[in-house]
């Protein structure tokens, strides 16, 4: 969508974006190239000064936030130069705020159990970004899922439990995910294990497929380490 220029991005387009919000990813298209023929300084909003492309970039950013976009469209040389030379602070800000930023806000689990026992893990998820994780589109349908796992002291993943009811595309600002998952501890030997949680790619042996917005010190090969489990025979 041609964001930023109010003479192009009018109410009907805003309504269109609103109708498809969190149903399909929305891409931010630039609103005025400094070296092109867009005379952005005559925009009806009166916000933009001639020779100040950073004014347009800020307008684009604000409209992108309102439209809950998933991606910035940086593809034309003069436009990219404008973003990086005059408005790089907004590019960095989009890295923190835009798209989807998924992480587990709370994970509750047992730390002692017996082999073969069934235990419950409660986990809550939040999206910090404006956009959404588009697992509802045909290309990604069923591809990425929440998974709870156990790792032994040799760093081997010995147990995985998919959370099929968790729909990542529904985690949007103001709407967290809350789940309780049963994990059967069959086949586990006596010893110590580490609880892990992650967003896995079901087409690649349920290995971590999406990065979480989690401190890297808490991660092991894409999994988030959440606690310890001791198995007693």
Region spans (language model):
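Generic, low-specificity signal for short hydrophobic/alpha-helical stretches with a mild N-terminal bias
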Residues: 54, 86-89, 140, 179
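Catalytic-core regions of glycoside hydrolase
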Residues: 1-78
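Extracellular/luminal regions of secreted and cell-surface proteins that mediate adhesion/ECM remodeling
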Residues: 95-233
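Catalytic cores of secreted or luminal carbohydrate-active enzymes
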Residues: 56-110
């Amino acid at each position: 969508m041609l964001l930023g220029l109010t003479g192009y991005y009018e109410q009907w387009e805003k309504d269109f974006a609103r109708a498809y919000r969190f149903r399909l990813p929305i891409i931010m298209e630039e609103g005025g190239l400094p070296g092109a023929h867009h005379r952005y300084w005559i925009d009806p909003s009166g916000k933009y000064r001639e020779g100040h492309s950073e004014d347009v970039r800020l307008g684009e950013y604000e409209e992108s936030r309102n439209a809950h976009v998933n991606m910035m469209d940086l593809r034309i040389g003069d436009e990219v130069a404008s973003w990086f030379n005059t408005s790089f602070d907004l590019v960095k800000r989009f890295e923190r705020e835009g798209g989807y930023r998924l992480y587990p806000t709370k994970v509750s689990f047992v730390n002692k159990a017996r082999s073969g026992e069934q235990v419950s893990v409660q986990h809550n998820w939040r999206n910090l970004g404006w956009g959404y994780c588009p697992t509802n589109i045909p290309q990604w349908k069923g591809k990425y899922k929440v998974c709870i796992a156990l790792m032994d002291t040799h760093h081997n993943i010995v147990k995985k439990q998919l959370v099929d009811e968790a729909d990542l595309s529904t985690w949007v600002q103001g709407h967290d995910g809350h789940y309780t998952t049963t994990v059967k501890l069959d086949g586990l030997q006596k010893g110590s294990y580490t609880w892990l949680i992650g967003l896995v790619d079901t087409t690649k042996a349920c290995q971590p497929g999406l990065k979480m917005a989690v401190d890297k010190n808490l991660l092991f090969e894409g999994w988030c380490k959440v606690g310890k489990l001791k198995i007693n025979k």
